[in-house]
Amino acid sequence: MKKLLAIAAFSFSALFASAQNSEAYFLSQPCLTPDGQTVVFSFEGDLWKADVANGNATRLTAMQGYETNARVSPDGKWIAFSGRQYGNADVYIMPVAGGEIKQLTYHSAGDEVSSWGWDSKYIYFTSTRESRGSGYKVSINGGTPVRVFGNYFFQYDHNLFEHPSSGEIFFNDTWESSNQVQRKHYKGPFNPDIQSYNPATKKYKRYTDYIGKDFGATLDKKGNIFFISDEANNEYNLYTFDNGKKTPLTTFNSSIKNAIVNADGGKVVFEKDYQLYMYDVAAKKAEKLKINIIRNSILSKEKDFDVKGNITNFDVSPDGKKLAFTSRGEIFVSDVEGKFIEQIKKGSAERALEVKWLSDNKTILFNQTVGGFLNWFTIAADGTA
């Protein structure tokens, strides 16, 4: 008996571990804490965080709508993100450890978070409130957002990222690095470059002049610049500047997305093939982060189902003792006198249309749409098969 219990316990533990350790896909828009030990990302419309070492992820948000564009403040205390609780994207912040969420912007236009100021007191974001898209910043205490470049520069500026010491604001200003970022191999007059503008000195600087795509500059606290380009092999890869020279860091044959360096430097996280990867600057290599999604499981709740006035099709069994019928797409069986009614779980969310008893008085024939086609199926009247 003890041996049997031990085997059962081991089997359950192995099954639980297998379920929890399966690698997750469709993770997006990652960022890192300043020390590079924790990754924050979007999954199934919510924000999650995971320990880089063991990959175990827990949910941070459960708001209505999608939460995206998470960015951790340089001091490691806050997460800024875009939330769509009211339909359009607004800027929100919350503690890195989880806790109270505070809304910072309230405009009916979309506000997409880009990055933090290095003092961790304000957030850069892109908004369509005055044009097709422009860069703004807002205090963590709220208040009226301020347009970063004023009213006379770069009418489509986005991907804003502040240099830690020079005062430069790095940005892109073409739709090819915004709503057409998925269009690879583009070469033409609207190609994005790595460029910056200093609002204090009013000096503009362009760092790249490749006819293809260079975009998404991200900087660490030492001013090291990382960005995405498709110059080497027509696929988006991670690049940096080595003594001012554009230098590839990865040579993937499938494109990366949304690269962000940690504030302290040394780690760059990004998306690739629907999973998360991290590039180690010192080791000069990228590795996949094995993220394990740990969900808060729920137990489905039984609901009352009123069939009165909602019966659409029925059939009496050959022995005259039972009645099968459909109501709101579900199958029910009752005795002919209506003393009991039982729902038959058909194992599909598709609605059943018609029911018919077979001659054995135990089997029900019904039709429903599966895979786009209407077909016939059978099910036991007691719901056992």
Language model feature labels by segment:
Residues M1-S22:
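Bacterial Sec-dependent N-terminal signal peptides
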Residues Q20-A24, S42-W48, T61-T68, A80-Y92, ...:
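A flexible loop/linker signature enriched in serine peptidases of the S9 family
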Residues C31, R71, S115-G117, F161, ...:
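Conserved beta-strand position repeated across blades of beta-propeller domains
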Residues P34-D35, P74-D75, W118-D119, P164-S165, ...:
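Residue-level detector of Asp-centered blade-edge/turn motifs that repeat once per structural unit
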Residues A57:
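Glycine/alanine-rich phosphate-binding loops at beta-alpha junctions
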Residues A286-N292:
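Short, solvent-exposed beta-strand-terminating loops
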